[in-house]
Design a protein with these regions (language model features):
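Conserved PLP-enzyme active-site core in the AAT-like
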Residues: 3-12, 78-312
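General small-molecule cofactor/ligand-binding pocket signal
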Residues: 73, 123-127, 350
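Short, glycine-/Ser/Thr-/acidic-enriched flexible segments
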Residues: 29, 171, 224-226, 241-243, ...
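Conserved N-terminal alpha-helix of the aminotransferase class I/II PLP-enzyme fold
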Residues: 36-81
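Conserved C-terminal alpha-helix-loop-beta "cap" of PLP-dependent enzymes
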Residues: 300, 304-448, 454, 459-463
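Terminal helix/beta-alpha structural elements that buttress the NAD(P)+-binding lobe
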Residues: 467
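N-terminal "arm"/small-domain region of PLP-dependent enzymes with the aminotransferase-like
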Residues: 1-54, 190
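Short active-site oxyanion
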Residues: 70-72, 99-103, 445
Length: 472
């Protein structure tokens, strides 16, 4: 598919034109780090991100065709901006029932959701992991049956949510059954909103697993996480049945939460990515996923030969193909210790916690990255002692968190209220102010407005959170 790159072409032409830059930015195109000649602002001909009529409009139209959406909008401020805009639009499109708006959301949500709730002043009813789940901060599998029950209960109470919000893929690579969840939402006329920050590439797999293709009403993608785009590049995607379709309204929602000085370096990167996606990217993506699947099988075969208590590489139908998630329990160590060992071998991971290590690959990783990783992991496997026990199932910790959770005030009241930082061990009974997170994965243990309980303290200590903000 032939693809234009209008933003890239305009900026390069301007950089070569010799025009006196009597406008922002202050570096005037003079190289300090090397990118400055291509760093411009919304000059004549450069279009406007939140009111495009020229090169940005053309580039977004290209992205829309590539993703097969009703409209794909650019963001230069990551999925965080898109999440806020998406929730604002869902609120705008929801029927008014005279009650406080409420969102039904899976508990493993990024803190951007809580910030949106504070800014837009809505409540959240949480979907929790089942008792059969393994027990991990990043995971919250939601079944169609669980969603049906939760939605039915809320509708019966006369408090239909303005949306259902799930994260898929999650930080550990788990994916939700989006088609099944979308069918449940459609039956109740509630939009399914997906934080697809880690899954922009899913559109370009042979089976097209992108949330919009699978029935979501809206979703956000962090292009920079899995596509060849610089940090900050993202998309807000709308399906044809999204609650708001008016382009001006959508751009207004993005502008509400965005800077009036969008980065043209990021816009050029998004624009250039269109040409990559229209080229041989799908073929290279298949090769990347196949290489990772081969690596998983090889590692798990070696782990089985060493009689490790669990597979080293997390695998299964509910795992996305382009993350390699390692279970450090297979090696008898913590995820953070495994990450340290990899770092000593010049392998930098995306995320590590007490049990797991997440490694993110893309088609841009050279073959030697796979080889080096496999060599190091096989060396670690060779040193595994005999008789390791299976790791303890931690689902009970999250069940206790759910049982003890009490919302003492709204999220908005907590985030905007007077607050103080206290050590975790002194926080019992206090009310959480700002979300308690480590970043990554930026997923809260205690939610703003909730009372800090013994279960919350135990989990915070397990995940290395030493202090938190509470209301005064």
């Amino acid at each position: 598919m032939s693809m234009t790159t209008p933003i890239v072409d305009f900026v390069r032409s301007y950089a070569k034109s010799g025009t006196a830059r009597l406008h922002m930015p202050g570096h005037k195109g003079q190289s300090l780090l090397g990118f400055e000649p291509l760093d411009i602002t919304e000059i004549c001909g450069a279009d406007e991100l939140y009111a495009p009529e020229g090169i940005i409009a053309e580039s977004e139209a290209n992205a829309t065709r590539l993703f097969g959406t009703a409209h794909s909008y650019y963001s230069t401020e990551g999925s965080s901006q898109c999440i806020r805009a998406m929730l604002f639009l869902a609120l705008q499109g929801a029927p008014q029932n005279g009650k406080r708006p409420v969102l039904l959301a899976a508990r493993n949500a990024h803190k951007a959701l809580l910030y949106a709730a504070a800014l837009l002043d809505f409540d959240i009813c949480w979907l929790w992991p089942s008792a059969q789940a393994e027990g991990a901060l990043c995971s919250c599998p939601v079944t169609a049956e669980a969603l049906t029950g939760a939605l039915h209960a809320m509708v019966q109470q006369g408090n239909t949510p303005f949306g259902v919000y799930v994260t898929s893929p999650d930080y550990l690579g788990g994916v939700q059954d989006i088609p099944a969840l979308a069918a449940v939402c459609r039956a109740q006329d509630v939009p399914l909103l997906v934080d697809n920050a880690h899954g922009a590439y899913l559109r370009f797999l042979p089976q097209n697993c992108h949330p919009i293709a699978q029935g979501a009403a809206m979703c956000c993608d962090s292009a920079h996480k899995t596509l060849p785009v610089v940090t900050g590049g993202a998309y807000l995607h709308l399906a044809h049945d999204a609650p708001v379709q008016d382009e001006a309204a959508v751009r207004g929602a993005l502008a509400l939460f965005g800077s009036t000085s969008p980065s043209y370096l990021i816009l050029q990167s998004l624009d250039a990515c269109n040409a990559v996606l229209a080229g041989d990217y799908p073929r290279r993506l298949v090769q990347c996923c196949a290489a990772l699947e081969g690596l998983r099988r090889s590692l798990n075969k070696a782990a089985a030969a060493r009689q490790c208590p669990v597979p080293l590489a997390v695998a299964g139908a509910q795992q996305e193909p382009m993350k390699l998630t390692l279970d450090a329990a297979a090696l008898g160590c913590t995820g953070t210790a495994l990450a340290d060992a990899l770092r000593r071998a010049q392998l930098e991971c995306e995320y590590a916690d007490p049990r797991y290590v997440v490694l993110m690959f893309t088609p841009e990783n050279p073959p030697q990255d796979y080889t080096r990783l496999q060599t190091v992991l096989e060396q670690l496997l060779a040193a595994v002692p005999a008789g390791l026990l299976r790791p303890e199932n931690r689902a009970g910790e999250f069940a206790a968190l759910q049982q003890q959770a009490v919302q003492r005030c709204t999220i908005r009241q907590a985030v905007l209220g007077a607050q103080v930082r206290v050590p975790v061990h002194k926080a019992l009974g206090r009310v959480c102010a700002m979300p308690t997170v480590s970043c990554p994965p930026a997923i809260p243990v205690a939610v703003s407005g909730e009372e800090i309980t013994p279960a919350a303290i135990a989990l915070m200590q397990r995940y290395g959170i030493k202090e938190l903000s509470v209301l005064r």
